[in-house]
């Protein structure tokens, strides 16, 4: 969330920066509400002063034995006016808060300006894409030929955008996550963390998913305990409806499946004042992630690239504001290190103003080479959110003067496990249908060097 003081003092500058993000700031609405807020605050202060003055007159009149009924009536009238003014002030402040919660972060000055992903800027490349003396297959064909990847059964069980991995492919998927965690903990200094997979609305507001992106989430409403669960009644019919909630349409008692472990990891410092000696805080977690992909209809419908359920090893850093951009380079390098150890070619892209995520001030995307597509595809997104999330979470530390100051938060994938598996299948495929296992993973696979087709 942006600093309301910044909007009040540099509104035109903020609106211009937001326009670079393709966000149209509701200037007229905000200005009208802000003007009304100022007037109401002045009115409430004046009414309070008048009521206090009249209350003193009552005491003076009674001490002199005079009739105070007129003054009592005036105090009652002023009290009614004050209640009305305070009620309207609460409404106006809630409306301003609603606007604030919809506004994305401001881009850092180093972010390239652009209108679409085509304006993203390449920063560097690593590795050379492999060449094949045969036509490379995509991961779906490879997995099915191995007899270890079954999309039809996954669709039967759950529907579209789910995967079923078996045997050595499921083992390789698990090995990848274990390998990533080991590297980040042992070499990069992160603390492994086990987090809840269900979080409340306040946690999602803290990291910026709510209220703006509710449609991208899987919500798990809680059934009222007083209501019996009827065997033949639709589940939705037994659940309470809270669509009129003032906080963006969600009931704070309801839970949501995490879209990324960034949410629970970052919220560890919500409503806390952190000892500065503990900074930086570096956390990692391996979790499933759940996304509705509401805005992705028709995109990447084949295979594992875009799933409702996938696994990811997440990296989160909580840092002193003066160090956050150094931390962004470090965190991005930690994600890159995984690809380098796996010998997977990739490139790093600096996202332009229009392509960054809602909470980010600056983002690097890491894209891995997929031979069958002949292109690089995102496998990690590493962002510095500056104080944007910390302000929503009230995550602070004490500065040198002993005053609470907002922390800076960073997050990145280190990496998306499923997409890394896809990249291995495609980059290490062989003409006989087998897939070579990267050397750094063979120890996690009991010494297995190749995945071999089931009919070989």
From Swiss-Prot:
Pathway: Aminoacyl-tRNA biosynthesis; selenocysteinyl-tRNA(Sec) biosynthesis; L-seryl-tRNA(Sec) from L-serine and tRNA(Sec): step 1/1
Entry binding sites for ATP: 291-293, 378-381
Broad EC category: ligase
Domain of life, per lineage: Bacteria
Residues covered by region (Disordered): 107-130, 229-253
Residues spanning the membrane: none
EC number in record: 6.1.1.11
Compositional bias ranges of the Polar residues kind: 239-248
Protein keywords: Aminoacyl-tRNA synthetase, ATP-binding, Cytoplasm, Ligase, Nucleotide-binding, Protein biosynthesis
UniProt biased composition (Basic and acidic residues): 114-125
Residues at which L-serine binds: 260-262, 314, 413
UniProt GO BP: selenocysteine biosynthetic process; seryl-tRNA aminoacylation
InterPro entries per record: aa-tRNA-synt_IIb, aa-tRNA-synth_II, aa-tRNA-synth_II/BPL/LPL, Ser-tRNA-ligase_type_1, Ser-tRNA-synth_1_N, SerRS_1_N_sf, SerRS_core, tRNA-bd_arm
Swiss-Prot/TrEMBL catalytic activity: tRNA(Ser) + L-serine + ATP = L-seryl-tRNA(Ser) + AMP + diphosphate + H(+); tRNA(Sec) + L-serine + ATP = L-seryl-tRNA(Sec) + AMP + diphosphate + H(+)
Pfam families referenced in this protein's UniProt entry, alphabetically: Seryl_tRNA_N, tRNA-synt_2b
General function of this protein: Catalyzes the attachment of serine to tRNA(Ser). Is also able to aminoacylate tRNA(Sec) with serine, to form the misacylated tRNA L-seryl-tRNA(Sec), which will be further converted into selenocysteinyl-tRNA(Sec).
Entry's free-text remark on domains: Consists of two distinct domains, a catalytic core and a N-terminal extension that is involved in tRNA binding.
Protein family per UniProt: Belongs to the class-II aminoacyl-tRNA synthetase family. Type-1 seryl-tRNA synthetase subfamily.
Subunit field text: Homodimer. The tRNA molecule binds across the dimer.
Descriptive protein name: Serine--tRNA ligase
Organism field: Nitrosospira multiformis (strain ATCC 25196 / NCIMB 11849 / C 71)
